[in-house]
Structure formats: structure tokens, C-alpha cells
């Protein structure tokens, strides 16, 4: 095991802070949790500390906490575990979420490590969400399971998801998510083109979503038709 990967233990703690605005409304969220990086599971408990109750559906925040740290993804031996190897220095990501009704979320996350605890410093901006849409009306009910495709480009790792929220009364609310992952450590070996399958659920919440518990399972894989490249 490399020195970098050895700093990631079988169980890791999570401490996070999110500062954000939604259609101009300011809010802050703090959270703590733990997870098993090699198994691909983690759970966080979150609390709105400023700006609550939030004037929008909680679910658009879920990916910022859970999809937020790719160190909590199970990788098979034939997929290079690039972001675990970025520690102890850590990594950053920038994300855009384009919703079908014109709503837009722009998010950044700086992930660092102290001892056996990951710290997430998250900045969130939500814009252009229509007042009659499912987010402002709080009609979203959860995320479908998703598959993110990941590929290296110009020294960073790019992730794309065509995602969907379920809504009250049936149907879906579509969203395209793009994330750029950047290791702080130079000259890390990049993985090839691969996928990460994710299931994100809310385990518990109060009526106003002032306190929420989320759980995630995430597994990396190749496409079923994948064929390793042969050395020339």
C-alpha cells in the first residue's frame, strides 16, 4: 500500500460546513458523519444553523454532501483509486447542476484531511429557480440511483451524470451534473474511463428539514463491454 493510501483508514470521520445562497437567500449547514471508504458507504447528520427553515426542497443539497467525497467509493483493483491517493493533501471539486426548468446550482468543495477525519468546505449557489417549480414548491421526494461517467482530461478528472429527482404525484425532474475533480498533489496517476454507481437516500429528517440524516452507497466499475487496452 502506498503512503498516500495508507492515511485512509477502514473507517473515517466527516466534518463539514456549507455556506450558500438560493435565489438570494443566505443559509449555512454544519454536519458530521462517518463512513467506510473501501466499502463505499458513508452517513452524515446535517443541521441548518443559519437561514432556516430553507425556502426550497432539501434534495438539491444532497449531492453536495454525499457525492461530495469520492474517497467514499469502492474501487475494484483494476480501476486506479485516484482521489484516495490524493490524501493527505486532498483535492477540490467544482460542480454545475443544470435543471430542466432553468434552475442552476454552482458548487465548490475543498476536501482536506486531519488525522482520521475528512473536512469539507462547501460553497453553494442556487439561481434562477422558478417560484412555481418543484424545488421552490418543495415537491421533490428523492434522487433516483445514478451512474456517473468519469474520465481524465488535461490533468483533472471529469464526471458527468444525467440525473433525475422524483416528484410528488409521480414523474421526474431532470438534471445534468458536471464535476471537475482536482488533486492538490501533483503527478498522480489518473484512472481511465470508468463509471461510479451511486444510491443516495435520506434516512431521517424533521418536518422542516432543519435536521437531516443521509446515507450513500457508491461503487466504481467498468462498462460490461470494457476491454483492457493491450500494450503496443
From Swiss-Prot:
Pfam family, one: GFP
First and last residue of the signal peptide: none
Residues modified to 2,3-didehydrotyrosine: 67
InterPro entries (alphabetical): GFP (IPR009017), GFP-related (IPR011584), Green_fluorescent_prot (IPR000786)
Biotechnology: Fluorescent proteins have become a useful and ubiquitous tool for making chimeric proteins, where they function as a fluorescent protein tag. Typically they tolerate N- and C-terminal fusion to a broad variety of proteins. They have been expressed in most known cell types and are used as a noninvasive fluorescent marker in living cells and organisms. They enable a wide range of applications where they have functioned as a cell lineage tracer, reporter of gene expression, or as a measure of protein-protein interactions.
Coiled coil: none
Post-translational modification remark: Contains a chromophore consisting of modified amino acid residues. The chromophore is formed by autocatalytic backbone condensation between Xaa-N and Gly-(N+2), oxidation of Tyr-(N+1) to didehydrotyrosine, and formation of a double bond to the alpha-amino nitrogen of residue Xaa-N. Maturation of the chromophore requires nothing other than molecular oxygen. The precise stereochemistry of the tyrosine has not been determined.
Example of a GO biological process term: generation of precursor metabolites and energy
2-iminomethyl-5-imidazolinone (Gln-Gly) crosslink site(s): 66-68
Keyword DNA-binding found: no
Keywords: Chromophore, Luminescence, Photoprotein
Expressed in which tissues: Oral disk.
Family membership noted in the UniProt record: Belongs to the GFP family.
Main function: Pigment protein that is green in color.
Name under which the protein is recorded: GFP-like fluorescent chromoprotein dsFP483
Organism listed in the record: Discosoma striata (Striped mushroom)
Amino acid at each position: 500500500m502506498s503512503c498516500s493510501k495508507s492515511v485512509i483508514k477502514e473507517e473515517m470521520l466527516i466534518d463539514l460546513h456549507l455556506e450558500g445562497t438560493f435565489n438570494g437567500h443566505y443559509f449555512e449547514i454544519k454536519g458530521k458523519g462517518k463512513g467506510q471508504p473501501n466499502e463505499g458507504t458513508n452517513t452524515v447528520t446535517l443541521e441548518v444553523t443559519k437561514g432556516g427553515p430553507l425556502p426550497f426542497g432539501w434534495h438539491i443539497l444532497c449531492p453536495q454532501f454525499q457525492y461530495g467525497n469520492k474517497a467514499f467509493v469502492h474501487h475494484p483493483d483494476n480501476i486506479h483509486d485516484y482521489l484516495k491517493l490524493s490524501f493527505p493533501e486532498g483535492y477540490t471539486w467544482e460542480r454545475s447542476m443544470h435543471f430542466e426548468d432553468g434552475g442552476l446550482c454552482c458548487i465548490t468543495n475543498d476536501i482536506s484531511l486531519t488525522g482520521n477525519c475528512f473536512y469539507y468546505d462547501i460553497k453553494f449557489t442556487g439561481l434562477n429557480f422558478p417560484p412555481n417549480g418543484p424545488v421552490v414548491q418543495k415537491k421533490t421526494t428523492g434522487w433516483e440511483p445514478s451512474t456517473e461517467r468519469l474520465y481524465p482530461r488535461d490533468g483533472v478528472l471529469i464526471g458527468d451524470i444525467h440525473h433525475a429527482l422524483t416528484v410528488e404525484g409521480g414523474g421526474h425532474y431532470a438534471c445534468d451534473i458536471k464535476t471537475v475533480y482536482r488533486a492538490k498533489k501533483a503527478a498522480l496517476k489518473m484512472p481511465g474511463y470508468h463509471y461510479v454507481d451511486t444510491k443516495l437516500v435520506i434516512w431521517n429528517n424533521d418536518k422542516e428539514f432543519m435536521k437531516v440524516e443521509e446515507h450513500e452507497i457508491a461503487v466504481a466499475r467498468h462498462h460490461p463491454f470494457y476491454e483492457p487496452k493491450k500494450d503496443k
